[in-house]
A protein has these predicted regions:
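Sec-dependent N-terminal signal peptides of Gram-positive bacterial secreted proteins and lipoproteins
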Residues: 4-27
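Structural signature of tandem-repeat unit edges
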Residues: 8, 49-50, 54-57, 66-94, ...
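Low-complexity, acidic Ser/Thr/Pro-rich repeat tracts that form intrinsically disordered stalk/linker regions
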Residues: 23-51, 56-58, 801
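Cellulosome-associated attachment modules in secreted, modular CAZymes
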Residues: 23-27, 738-801
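Short domain-boundary/entry signatures in modular proteins, especially
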Residues: 66, 383, 519, 625-631, ...
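Consensus positions within tandem repeat domains that build extended binding/scaffold surfaces
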Residues: 99, 119-122, 142-145, 165-168, ...
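Proteolytic cleavage junctions
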Residues: 628-640, 682, 709-742
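Proteolytic processing hotspots in large secreted/extracellular or virion-associated proteins
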Residues: 662-704, 709
Length: 801
């Protein structure tokens, strides 16, 4: 075949010469390149101001040496063959590559129809290039082809264009609009990044993905028109598009990647988002830091995953509408959404990430998914919720999960809860009540420190309590600690200034350093199981007048019972004690800076030759070798009150009046002003202290005791145990007020009002907490249900019938 072509060409040339026509061997590359293999084309060279390379019979212009401002790209370049260097072969130009790189002269270029590819760095840094005219056969615009053409104001993307590569038009800071054709199927990374004048983008329907960084930092972009067919928007695709106010996403979109619309480095204008119905996943930081995104954010029905910090810092969003199919809300997803008012998680949510709603400080209502098994670290840190109901599916509360929720006043814990982690409710300064479920095993460090709990009863399943777990709760009056807890840790109840009663059950072995320091215990009974009391365990305790140590105690740390007041008159130390630390017993100091002194009437009891005797001798403390001093029981039949005094042979009389009546607190009923008088051999006698036991009716929930001191009254709250309250005092007069059960008073304010009805109704909807759950069984059928709600409605509104 090649031989025939040669013969044809030679014959044609001969005819032309006979006719007097000058002919150059022009190559028509519509023919196969192999037809010209004998010519051995020279594949690189120059033609005028252009350098070129040839491959497969097509020319690529690789350089331009001219200085013209207006340039027209030639349709073809001439080359020769190695065997016939005098012959010129015309080769069509189909591509440009690095042709005008860093050319500051060119302002306008015309590209012929035959060019299908504008390749790598073709016009990069042509900072005066304003207009580009190209043919309809253009299929590909290569990497950085027009990058940093800062004067380029427009570009016509015509049908037939298939590919725009990475950085193709990045840093084109004068480009104002982009309309992509339907033929375009590939849009490269950073294709239009940093085009600061770009105002509008319209996608054709051939694009399935918007690539990473494609329009990042297009700071003037106000309009994006997405076509149906786009399925994914890659990371940072529209990040820092600070002028964008409204966003409407197509129904075809299923995935939005990391930081796709994130306001990373700039102020934001985005105010609303309309999500398409097909969206399934929102990636990390996808819409983070849009501070003007406001109002209701409605998430689409197909959405299953919200990524890390996806809407973090969207501080103007007030309401979230989650779809029922949502499964995962990841770390920090709505962190710092400070105007958010409520959170209602559908039961399909099984995973909640750390800090998911951290610092949403205006959230008042929280409804958790019934499928969650763990509430992670910092999930609701600093939120404004007032009451909390944790579903029974939850077994673990993480570190600082509800820390600094300053309005949280009541919590209903999961009945299957096993672990409350470090600082879980730290500094919830309004938290007044909580009921710990049976089955709870661990309470972490500072878990309830600086709350306002009034009473705690720890379940007998608890085996681990963290340091400072109940640190600095001045409102705490009573604590019950089970024997399942072998160690009461360091500072567990430190600075609980109001703690006047503690029940320590058999099984506890160690009380660590400062565990009850600065409490206000009146009496202390330690179980026989305790073998060690740490340094300063009860240091600074005020008003403590009686202590009963366990029979197996071995170690008493230094300053263990260095008290704040001179109220302890005696103490029996069992023979089992083998070590007593410095100033551990018998000393008191009103303030920390005062030098401790031995109590003015203190006597230490113990066995001869015991550690107690050695301690007494070395500290110049009075010591008596005898068994533990007993208390004498005195009973008043008229009142039913039993009093124990450290003296025998006394006569007791108790009088009740209302002469010094103080106004009871709301919800309390005045019972009387009680005066206890003792005589001995006909003369008035005042024992060093009294242990008072007052019987209580079954429906009494708690009592307030007002005791008169020289500097005024002080108040203690007691909860009946086994049908009575018990307290120790050095005074002989007190006022007693009682708070009885009031059916319907579920908010525990002493009255039954509409507020109780609202609280009970929220509780029934599994979205609330009862402050006094024992008052919820209005029809006395031993269950709290809809009948009780109806009963309360009829009580408040008889017309309901």
């Amino acid at each position: 075949m090649n031989s025939n072509i040669k013969k044809w060409a030679v014959s044609l040339s001969a005819i032309a010469l006979l006719c007097g026509i000058s002919v150059l061997p022009i190559v028509n590359f519509d023919l196969q390149a192999s037809a010209w293999e004998d010519y051995e084309l020279v594949t690189s060279g120059t033609d005028g101001n252009f350098s070129f390379s040839i491959q497969d019979g097509k020319a690529t212009l690789t350089d331009y040496t001219g200085s013209d401002a207006i340039v027209t790209i030639p349709e073809a370049v001439g080359t020769t063959t190695k065997t016939t260097p005098s012959k010129t072969v015309s080769v069509p130009v189909t591509a440009l590559e690095q042709t005008f790189y860093n050319n500051s002269n060119i302002t306008s270029v015309t590209i012929p129809d035959g060019v299908t590819t504008i390749g790598y760095n073709t016009f990069t840094y042509c900072d005066n290039l304003k207009t580009v005219s190209h043919g309809k056969q253009l299929q590909s615009i290569g990497e950085s082809a027009f990058s940093s053409c800062s004067a380029l104001e427009s570009f016509s993307f015509q049908e037939g264009l298939l590919t725009i590569a990475n950085d193709a038009f990045s840093n084109c800071t004068s480009l104002k609009s982009v309309t992509l054709p339907n033929s375009l199927t590939t849009l490269g990374e950073s294709a239009f990044q940093n085009d600061s004048a770009l105002e509008s983008v319209q996608f054709g329907n051939g694009i399935a993905e918007v690539s990473a960084h494609a329009f990042e930092s297009c700071s003037s972009l106000t309009s994006i028109t997405f076509s149906e067919g786009i399925q994914r928007i890659r990371e940072n695709a529209f990040a820092d598009c600070s002028a964008l106010k409204k966003l409407t996403l197509p129904n075809s979109l299923t995935q939005i990647d990391s930081k796709a619309f994130c306001a990373i480095h700039s102020e934001t204008s985005l105010r609303s988002i309309s999500f398409g119905s097909g969206l399934q996943e929102i990636g990390p930081y996808a819409f983070a830091f849009h501070t003007k995104l406001a109002g209701i954010l409605t998430l689409p029905e197909q959405l299953t995953t919200i990524g890390d910090y996806a809407f973090s810092g969207c501080s103007s969003v007030t309401q979230l509408q989650f779809p029922n199919g949502l499964q995962s809300i990841q770390k920090g997803a709505f962190q710092n959404c400070s105007e958010l008012r409520a959170i209602s998680l559908p039961n399909t949510v099984t995973t909640l990430g750390e800090s998911a709603f951290e610092n949403c400080n205006n959230v008042k209502n929280l409804s958790l998914s019934g499928s969650l098994t763990e509430l992670p670290n910092l999930a609701f840190y600093g939120c404004g919720i007032s009451d909390l109901c944790i579903p029974d599916s939850v077994t673990q509360i993480g570190v600082e999960t509800f820390s600094n929720c300053s309005s949280l006043s009541a919590v209903q814990l999961s009945r299957n809860l096993k672990t409350i982690s470090h600082s879980a409710f730290y500094n919830c300064e309004e938290l007044k009540s909580i009921s710990f479920p049976t089955g709870l095993e661990t309470i972490g460090e500072a878990a309830f420190a600086q709350t306002a709990l009034g009473s705690i009863s720890l379940p007998d399943t608890l085996t681990e309590l963290g340091q400072a777990a109940f640190y600095n709760i001045p409102q705490l009056k009573f604590a019950k600690i089970p024997g399942s807890l072998k160690t009461i840790p360091r500072s567990a109840f430190y600075n609980c200034y109001g703690l006047n009663a503690v029940e320590l059950q058999e099984g506890i072995e160690i009380i660590e350093e400062s565990a009850f320091a600065n409490a206000s215990l009146r009496s202390l009974i330690l179980p026989d199981s305790i073998i060690e009391i740490g340094d300063a365990a009860f240091q600074g305790v005020d008003y403590l007048s009686t202590i009963q140590l366990g029979s197996n105690l071995q170690l008493i740390g230094s300053k263990a019972f260095l008290l704040q007041s001179d109220t302890l008159c005696s103490l029996y130390v069992p023979e089992s004690v083998i070590s007593i630390g410095e100033k551990a017993i018998g000393y008191w100091a009103e303030f920390e800076w005062n030098t401790p002194t031995v109590g003015s009437h203190f006597i230490l009891y113990g066995e001869s030759g015991s550690e107690a005797q050695d301690y007494a001798k070395s500290n110049s403390i009075s010591f008596l070798t005898k068994s533990e001093p007993g208390l004498t029981k005195y009973y008043d039949a008229a009142t039913g009150i039993t009093v124990f005094a450290p003296d025998s042979g006394l006569q007791m009389q108790i009088s009740v009046s209302d002469s010094q009546k103080l106004e009871p607190d709301p919800g309390y009923t005045f019972q009387g002003w009680y005066q206890i008088q003792f005589t001995k051999n006909g003369n008035n006698y005042t024992p060093a202290f009294l242990q008072v036991q007052i019987p209580m009716e079954q429906n009494v929930r708690r009592c307030t005791v007002f005791i008169n001191r020289l500097n005024g009254f002080y108040t203690e709250i007691y909860y009946p145990q086994n049908g009575s309250i018990d307290f120790t005092t050095t005074k002989d007069a007190f006022q007693l007020d009682v708070c009885k059960q009031l059916l319907g008073d579920v908010n525990d304010d002493g009255t039954v009002t509409l507020a109780d009805l609202i609280m009970l109704q929220k509780y029934m909807l599994y979205n609330g907490t009862l402050l006094a759950p024992e008052n919820a069984d209005l029809n006395q059928d031993t269950a709290c249900n809809g009948f009780d709600l109806l009963y309360l409605k009829r009580t408040l509104f008889p017309s309901i019938g």
